[in-house]
Amino acid sequence: MKKSALFLLIILLAVVCVAQGDHVPAYNHGPLKPGDALPILPRDQWRGEAFQYPYQVRAYELAAEIPDVIYQMPCYCYCDRIGHNSLHSCFESTHGAHCGLCMKEVFYAYEQTMLKKTPTQIRAGIIRGDWKAINLESVAKSH
């Protein structure tokens, strides 16, 4: 029952956030400076209610593989309103595990990175909404 309620909450949040309009949320216009590093939530914290589904864990694994890319991506859950400055910010805490939009965007960014797309090209796809086609249940199994 808790899993169903959490899943419905994620879906509801996604629907509400998508309706926010055409504003492009905050993102960084270039990569991290050499020597700088931003942490993804440590693996030993990937448990509990925020990590009940395989796609939640997989989203964090992918975020850890492409931190420089997601640092340059906007996040359409509009978390810039709570101080986030890019999609990367979502995966520095459990925020990304609670938000279907964040997870879809990180799966999309990873797929496009594997296709050798540049961060600029990936960002354009995110702004177009290409990430909306991601199915979290099926994509987690294929990565």
Segments (PLM) and residue ranges:
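Secretory/periplasmic and organellar redox-cofactor proteins
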Residues: M1-A64, Y110-H143
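Short, flexible, mixed-charge glycine/proline-rich loop motifs
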Residues: A64-Y71
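Short, thiol/selenol-centered motifs that function as redox-active sites or metal-ligating centers
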Residues: M73-I82, S86-A109
